[in-house]
Amino acid sequence: MRVAVDVMGGDNAPHVEVEGAVAAAREFGVPVTLVGDVEKVRAELARHDCKGLDIEVWHASEVVGMHDSASDAVRKKKDSSIRVAFELVKGGEAVAVVSAGNSGATMAAGMFVLKRMKGIDRAAIAQLFPTVSGKTLVLDVGGNVDCKPIHLVQFAVMGEVYARFVMGVDNPKVGLLSNGEEASKGNELTRETSALLREKPINYIGYVEGRDIFNGSVDVVVCDGFVGNVALKLSEGLAEAVGKMLKAEIKSSFLSQIGYLLSRKAFNNFKKTVDYAEYGGAPLLGINGVGMICHGGSNPKAIKNAIRFAHEYALKGVNGRMAEKLNESFPGDAREREGAQAPDAGTERVAS
């Protein structure tokens, strides 16, 4: 089961992607196909010891830039590395795609080439957040800035399946992100969504607040892509700021430096917990295949872990489990009664 890696999309492509892919092949034994300019890719591979590693190169002559229109780029740049990578999955040459390129284009390519799963109107980008007791899955974190209640319900069902079969949570607690836990809080979107969620075969616990993402009280947090992207960027900025503040305090006095030396292991463990590279990337849920969206500035470690998680996702057959749960949650023509309306692939407004 090969993983196709878009090696031309990231801020530091193809150097970072190739190094991360080589590490994944060496450490985890994952077969990888590097998709991009064959000459540049082979030049990067020459810098590594690839003897005995299952690494293939697939040529793609075009690149989707970070500022390209997502849907236009996917349709017009038919030989772009990201579209070719998804075409490999469609053709059975790979089981998953990993990309650190334009997130909107990655999402659009996944939907355009592989199409949405039956019962899904909007694919969603999910992200794991560190908590005091493990991890919380938040979705959507940027795939769809405007959502209807039915979309959030679909996100909840997909997130529940992911938490159960990927995160290993027996009975995942699903919460709807709002400005308070009381039923009277929220807006029209959250109130309508909450009423629908209570009818679904999931462990829905009601409204949760932003702080609950990190305190371990909920396993899956559902929101629209606008709110989710703000939460994601806020958490990234906070983690970076806290790191800088700690460094400044440690350097402020000799006693602080002694204290740091004595507590270095604890600091390193904390750094590892909040390091996005440990999580690799954000899975794109709701397409007929596996897609992993990485941060544009990902380092080799992040790419390596994204490849590992994408491979595990495919091996566990999570999409099949999602299809079963969707059929259970939306029997017959229930989706039509609840106001589902599927747009054309690639037309969603995406938060970058």
Swiss-Prot record:
Annotated EC: 2.3.1.274
Compartment(s) where it occurs, according to its Swiss-Prot or TrEMBL record: Cytoplasm
Top-level enzyme category: transferase
Catalysed conversion reaction: a fatty acyl-[ACP] + phosphate = an acyl phosphate + holo-[ACP]
InterPro entries to which the protein is assigned, alphabetical: FA_synthesis, Phospholipid_synth_PlsX-like
Residue ranges of the region described as Disordered: 328-352
GO BP annotations, alphabetical order: fatty acid biosynthetic process; phospholipid biosynthetic process
Pathway membership, UniProt: Lipid metabolism; phospholipid metabolism
Domain of life per record: Bacteria
Start-end of Basic and acidic residues biased regions: 328-339
Any one GO molecular function term: phosphate:acyl-[acyl carrier protein] acyltransferase activity
Key word Cytoplasm present: yes
Role noted for this protein: Catalyzes the reversible formation of acyl-phosphate (acyl-PO(4)) from acyl-[acyl-carrier-protein] (acyl-ACP). This enzyme utilizes acyl-ACP as fatty acyl donor, but not acyl-CoA.
Record protein name field: Phosphate acyltransferase
Lineage of source species: Bacteria, Pseudomonadati, Thermodesulfobacteriota, Desulfuromonadia, Geobacterales
